[in-house]
Amino acid sequence: MKKYLAITSKGLENLLADELVALGVTDPKLVYAGVTFEAPIEVVYRCCLWSRIASRFIQILSEFDVRDDMDLYLGASAINWPNYFTADKTLVVDFNGTNREIRNSQYGALKVKDAIVDRFTKADLERPNIDKAEPDLRVHMRLSGEKGILGFDLIGSGLHQRGYRTEAGRAPLRETLAAALVLRSTWDESKPLLDPMCGSGTLLIEAALMACEMAPGVKREKWCFEALSDFDPEVWTEIRSEARVKSRRGVKKVDTHFYGFDRDYRVIQTARDNARRAGVEDLITFDVGDATKIERPEGFENGVVICNPPYGERLSTEPALIALYSEFGRQLKEQFGGCTASIYSSNDDLLACIRMRADKQFKLNNGALPCVQKNYSISESAERKEAANIEVAPEFMNRLKKNLSKLGKWARKEKLDCYRLYDADLPDYNAAIDVYKDYIIIQEYTAPKEISEDKARRRLTDMIRATVLVTGVETNNVILKVRQKQSGKNQYQKLAEKSRYFDVEEYGVKLIVNLQDYLDTGLFLDHKLTRKMIGDMAAGKDFLNLFAYTGSATVHAACGGAKSTMTIDMSRTYLEWAQKNMNTNDQTGTQHQFLQADCLQWLQQAEGEFDLIFIDPPTFSNSKRMDQTFDVQRDHIMLLENLKRMLRQDGTVVFSNNKRNFKMDEEALDKAGLQAKNISKQTLPLDFARNKHIHNCWIITHKED
């Protein structure tokens, strides 16, 4: 008997061996990502047609040492290729692997191709042609170190191509992988199966094919073994006909129920189309549904919930996924007691959010991505109701409810779309939570070193889940950021090209925010009362805004009736943002000027006079674009002395900064001919009342005679 290699994904070797034994193979031997065996041709045909897990079957012609390209050529030349196929058949060589001497797979494929063609030429036969697109035959060469395996790929395009899926949903699973997940999920034909995040339906379709005993290759039209000289059409026709009859009968006998849900109606339609092409459309009910709100179907006793939920590469950038897994886990416990669940993901942190202990788990890559499949037993009804009624982080949740009741009412009254809901009120939940219209930003402060990663992750997931439950925000509208002390060049670091800009309202003024591109959003929430005050003071005045950021104070001044405005910042990005803010409020014209400049240098040589000046400098700056460093405690008098020169006699400077324990040098200020009034308390909005040191704010005027 001839020797064969069945190829599969790493981690599925045992499962494949069991499948091959069921198909008639005796004495299979496990190898890396595959199984070798010897079998008669009818068993091989049956394996090709019926295997749900193998991606390819290789007829092994030779195994030989390959130290260099000469060994490769001689090893391939030793095979009498004309005995296996005729010259009218087209072929391609698939070369997998490299070693120290053969470092390029294309070069290796070329040497094997040369050896094959030369054997035909030496036998005075025509050369077979190469066809990379649609070859009759695929020659398979696998190189591992100095060991080579050479043979025919009996399949052609991989066995995962069942013929029913012409388009897929998000991040589709290969059919062979999906079949393996089903086989390891605790499901069998006697149990109903539900996929709450079904995408294009692959898991359910593969399970339905198993239930009705439909061969996965029954709809396949082309097989490379048909081009080999020893192909036995009678045996193959009999095996395929038997499979077709079995499939037709099987569909009629199945009484197992399959359910698929997805939030995207377009993907659901794709799943229905795929099921129709697979011939199992009558067995599966597909519908639009949210996995976090999914209800147990009637008659779903002892059923299995299986899914491949989305998973991000980095937990810190995917708060919506934390909320999704957390809420999905809660829904499983509440709705599916007595059932089992099988979940496949690459992210253990996300799987931990489900809050169930796995009975079994299997490591299994999705392509090159390491993943794990975990099987869970869901407790019966009494226990699950108790689990469902337990509040997530009750102390944190209660504080959030209290804050939302108080601050939400205040924000609506003040016509504020944005406010701080929570600001590290509880030491165990060290984060700031901001509301931006229909979005929530959770800004997690870096955990102390003595807090373990597991505990920090648990608290973070609790915060996200509790925030979603209390506020009712859509999980996709939750944004997570890790906040650290920012200085100089990384204060306005760009995060990603997601460009989520939208308008928010603040005391009747529209301002543009961006929640994801930068560490900050374009709007400092603690200054909302300061900006309102500037708007109230600005009527008929010439206004100057220094270190202007996105110009929100300028917008308030302009909307408050300022005669003119000058907005200065060193960043072109933020100046353009400021202009857009002004345009959004119909504040246009030459009376509104924008200047890109280093504010410190500009002040030293600037001319002109202003009635109202707002300056909110950084606490410290060492930007490469500034010639000197700046420290607000050290340099504030110098700053104010320069401003005095530009301030009209009855004018006002609103001076603010965020340095904790800032001390105004009133003696030096007096010598400079200026006087100061601390208005920090008056400019502290209700949502920042718990953080009295978030900023300090001063009214600076010329000293009265």
UniProtKB/Swiss-Prot annotation:
EC number(s) reported in the record: 2.1.1.173, 2.1.1.264
Single annotated GO MF: rRNA (guanine-N7-)-methyltransferase activity
Keywords: Cytoplasm, Methyltransferase, RNA-binding, rRNA processing, S-adenosyl-L-methionine, Transferase
Localization annotation: Cytoplasm
Xref: CDD domains: AdoMet_MTases, THUMP_AdoMetMT
GO cellular component: cytoplasm
Chief place where the protein resides: cytoplasm
Pfam families: Methyltrans_SAM, RlmL_1st, THUMP, UPF0020
InterPro entries: 23SrRNA_methyltr_KL (IPR017244), DNA_methylase_N6_adenine_CS (IPR002052), RlmKL-like_Mtase (IPR000241), RlmKL-like_Mtase_CS (IPR053943), RlmL_1st (IPR054170), SAM-dep_methyl-trfase (IPR019614), SAM-dependent_MTases_sf (IPR029063), THUMP_dom (IPR004114)
Domain called THUMP: residue spans: 43-154
Catalytic activity of the protein: guanosine(2445) in 23S rRNA + S-adenosyl-L-methionine = N(2)-methylguanosine(2445) in 23S rRNA + S-adenosyl-L-homocysteine + H(+); guanosine(2069) in 23S rRNA + S-adenosyl-L-methionine = N(2)-methylguanosine(2069) in 23S rRNA + S-adenosyl-L-homocysteine + H(+)
Keyword Hydrolase attributed: no
PANTHER family listed in its UniProt record: RIBOSOMAL RNA LARGE SUBUNIT METHYLTRANSFERASE K/L, RIBOSOMAL RNA LARGE SUBUNIT METHYLTRANSFERASE K_L
HAMAP family assigned to the protein according to its UniProt record, in alphabetical order: 23SrRNA_methyltr_KL
Family from the record: Belongs to the methyltransferase superfamily. RlmKL family.
Function text: Specifically methylates the guanine in position 2445 (m2G2445) and the guanine in position 2069 (m7G2069) of 23S rRNA.
Protein name per UniProt: Ribosomal RNA large subunit methyltransferase K/L
